[in-house]
């Protein structure tokens, strides 16, 4: 077992870029990153990625391993200040809950979807939003508001929206890119405009943009958010797997 570079870690995780998307994004976007690997036969057989997410001073730990023998030493090596553990492989759950005192985070379960093709609706018109739209976005009752929009552009994210009467009434963003995937996120529709297929339209357009740039489109929804899951399925996404998040007591 040894420390590995982010580049080594990325190459190992690339064997399953959809299943490992959260680990790959942690390597690219998080802070105070620690990577520990288990070597077998001269190659990595398991990996621990612990990092600070935005707005959280504690580390979040995630594991990927070929089998239980590779996972066991990574559990021992988990940093004591990793107070949050996210599990994306169901077979790891017993070993992790046995090794650590864990409390499930409320509403923490997420469903990951992926797609390689989408069907674009004929209407409404959805277009890429640019800095020229900043005033309209700021004047609209969006989830992110003007500052969130500018922050998204500064990070290289690609927002798409439906506009009417100089107001933004629906949007989604292509964000959190890895070399293989990109996520459709921040899906929002103005309350008075819901039930008209706008969410499906912005999700489909955003996913199509991701696919045109030769990445797999990812969509993440809370297990309890059935409406969001229906949008994903209607757009053409297929359920891939679930993740569970825990707070670590010891």
List each model region and its residues.
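Conserved acetyl-CoA-binding loop-helix of GNAT-fold acetyltransferases
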Residues: 66-78, 189, 195-211, 229-234
């Amino acid at each position: 077992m040894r420390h590995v570079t982010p580049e080594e870690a990325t190459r190992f995780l690339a064997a399953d870029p959809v299943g490992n998307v959260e680990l790959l994004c942690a390597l690219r976007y998080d802070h105070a990153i620690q990577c520990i690997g288990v070597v077998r036969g001269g190659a990595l057989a398991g990996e621990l990625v612990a990092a600070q997410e935005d707005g959280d001073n504690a580390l979040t730990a995630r594991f990927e391993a070929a089998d239980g023998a590779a996972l066991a030493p990574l559990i021992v090596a988990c940093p004591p200040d990793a107070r949050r553990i996210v599990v994306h492989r169901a077979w790891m759950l017993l070993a992790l809950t046995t090794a650590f005192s864990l409390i499930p985070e409320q509403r923490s379960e997420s469903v990951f979807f992926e797609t390689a093709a989408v069907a674009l609706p004929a209407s409404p018109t959805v277009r890429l939003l640019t800095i020229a739209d900043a005033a309209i976005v700021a004047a609209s009752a969006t989830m992110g508001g003007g500052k969130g929009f500018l922050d998204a552009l500064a990070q290289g994210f690609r927002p798409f929206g439906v506009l009417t009467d100089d107001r933004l009434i629906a949007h989604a963003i292509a964000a959190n890119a890895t070399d293989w995937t990109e996520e459709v996120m921040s899906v929002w529709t103005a309350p008075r405009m819901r039930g008209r297929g706008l969410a499906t339209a912005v999700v489909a357009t955003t996913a199509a943009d991701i696919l045109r740039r030769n990445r797999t489109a990812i969509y993440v929804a809370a297990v309890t958010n059935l409406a969001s899951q229906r949008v994903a399925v209607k757009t053409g996404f297929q359920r891939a797997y679930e993740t569970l998040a825990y707070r670590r007591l010891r």
